Amino acid sequence: MASKNLVRSSSGAVRRAIVVGGGLGGLMTVIKLCEANVPVLLFSLVPVKRSHSVCAQGGINASVNTKGEGDSPQVHLEETAYGGDFLANQPPIKGMCDAAPGIVFMLDRMGVPFNRTPEGLLDFRRFGGTLFHRTAFAGATTGQQLLYALDEQVRRFETVDVEDEHGVAIPGEKMVQKLESWDFLSAVLGDDGACVGIVAQDMKNMSVRAFRADTVCVATGGPGIIFGRSTNSVICTGTAAAAVYRQGAIYGNGECIQVHPTAIPGADKLRLISESARGEGGRVWVPKDAKDKRQPRDIPEKDRDYVLERMYPGYGNLVPRDIASRAIFKTCYHEHRGIFNEKTSKNENEVYLDLTHKDEAFLRKKLAGILEIYEKFAGVDPYKNPMKVFPAVHYSMGGLWCDFERDAKGSLVVGSPRNQSTNLPGLYAAGEVDYQYHGANRLGANSLLSCIYAGMVAGPAMASYRQAMPASAFDLPASLFEKAEKRERDSYERILGQNSNEKSPENAYVLHQELGETMLRDCTIERDNAILDKVLAKIGELDDRVKRVRVTDTASRMNQGAQFVRHLENMLLLARVIAQGAKNRDESRGAHYKPAFPKRDDAHWMRTTLARHKTVGSVEYIRAFDYNCAGKSVHITDEIDISLVKPRERKYEQAGAASAVAQGATTTSTAPPATTGNAKLEVR
């Protein structure tokens, strides 16, 4: 029997859920939990407004069709499935695409300053993988505007009292309590394996504490820093995902890592130049003569090779990111036709991204944010000179495996406790940390959408799970939480004190640099099994060397050195999942490309990679498993739900190839035509 009192436990404590992560996925999960009258503890490693979502530039997709091009959620679904090379389950994609217009209108009502047309309508730009203007945007700082808008809604709930079962406010209890500068260490698992709380560390005073929760959502972003230099923030280590993976959570499609085609090369950090630059008319080119010494503006059209337009005339500069990155990589690495550097007399790994043919006032209105970044860090005026760019690790399509429940028509059963649930009962995932929506390649501007939609789905699912609980986590014995807290405190003390007498200790930052260089060089755009064996051997070497790390900073406050050692141990765990998954998948699909296996192999590999932790140094890959959700046993296999869009070969040379509807052909979907919104999913 489910617990009757959903506000207080039998001991009188307020029954809270926990959300870990203050980005778009986490904030939307908090909002939907509060709307379901579930009090929340929100944990964030950094101040919420510094979450990595703030870095997103280009926009958010929604098939509103204000330009009368014939776009629709059905086309959006087809192009997302096609762009992901049919590695994503299609019902969650359908739910996301159906809900997208309502999400954008909701954000508009929240005050997001979207760009508008002269008529006052929301403006939309084109992004990669589509021929439609589908991407709503707020200049070139869309992520920041969305993050601030959702945080304002969460702050509103920080002032709302928790009411008891009689509608009386409980003194000192608010619907949301925000704990910033806390680092997630692990989940607290009950005797039955269910998640009943977390252990976290206060980075201000380094105290370790266990927190109870009826249900927990991890919304902690991607693992980009595993690759060293990337477009990701330094906080994107994947440490929370690795921690719960270590505890038994299954990791899905870890090998699917997106490399963005246009970033500013740098020795320390690769700074993103958004796809919106190409969406607003930017063109990628190199000189036809590999030894051309002229300045780019002195090179006439006839002497330029517009690489993407030549190779993919159907979509041109707006082919999906995996295809654009491989084309640029081929041009620079295999053909040695990158921009010629007269000082070094060699061709650099750079191509031109040119916006100089566009009106400056137009560019300042649409792209000022990213062009200011280029001017600041490259020292060149992008309004008058083409930008020099090269691909960079950007996003993880893989992540924590999470479930969904579909109905007979292919839509999600909204409110099902299975939606966004990991295989650990009570533990949910939302945002880049989950694997759910993008398959083997993410379309540009689907990331902000998937983060928000995942939160909208996770919140009601967590509320349903909580309602079905036979007993609250707040009624479990204190010894369970004390044991988990002691385990993590001992682990931290181990890091502080280890190798204190070692004569030649290792440096965690040097080890991370070696890991990043190895992963970036050998596990990104092109992959080779023999080289991946060397990557795995290197990870094994680093697993041994990390045990000899000595922390030089033993401060009792803000000890980032000790924290980084813990994060490095977790990064090594996920690095192995990524590299081993890449070695196992002997085909080319989306962002995963092996020249030795250049074709997609649906017969053997149209399935989810399911990785389960065994011990340090090994990964177990499984084809099926069972887990318990809200008292019901669920059987899961690695098969992909392709019931809505029939798989076919990707051919971006042909305009409109991504969508049967866009070509005017009969859709292969067995489901009825999609509407402009998901009637079951309440969007406020």
Which residue ranges define each predicted feature?
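Residue-level detector of alpha-helix initiation sites
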Residues: 23-24, 47, 141, 223-224
